[in-house]
Amino acid sequence: ALISSRLGLEFKSQLDIVAAALLHDVGGLMIPGNIRRKRKADITEDDEKKISQCYQNSYIAFKDNTDLSPDIKRILSASIAVLHPDIPAASAKMPTVIGAEILKVAYNFDNMTAMKFGDEPLSEIAAVRYLLEHVDEFDKKVVDALLNSINILSPGVCVEFTNGDNGLVVTANDSNVLEPFVLSFKDNKLYNLGDSAVARSMQIKDIMKTMDNRHVVDSDLLKQYTGKTINMG
């Protein structure tokens, strides 16, 4: 909904896209639990066929439902075509549908960053970098709308750099979310990551999950603690 709103689509179109997204995910709920609990690397070719069959069965049921509006069916059909091209019912060449492109970007971003059984989720930074790098696969306008919706590198966010240092986002970059102005904790200097000279030596690797506020405590001193005041010299 946020992506479609950022793209300026009319309200009815936004509702149709949300409805199509929910109907698409019904197919995912039909996937057997033993397959859903597998790590991605352990998914077999037979498992892939069963997964596709679940989405296909769901798609066919909704396609024949006379209560659904033609617009929702069109978005759902196009979404199945771009997300599950191996499904026979969606194999026919279809014109580009903006709703399907939105669902494609949202589905892939959610899939990469969501918690999964046995698999570590990608960070939002890694997911965004993947979407931006695969311009031939994902609509750039839709990816930009996603970035404008989630604000992952807003001022105040602590980040890790590729050179091993940590820092703080000072000013966001509307042109490229991965290239804001940052403050390096190492030398207390400001850096413009949009500057190619700076980018050659440091880029944003990931967002820091938490600031570590733990204190280092001497273990021998800790053993002496009995609830009374200790003279530390």
Name each model feature, range by range:
Residues 1-233:
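Histidine- and acidic-residue-rich, metal-dependent catalytic cores
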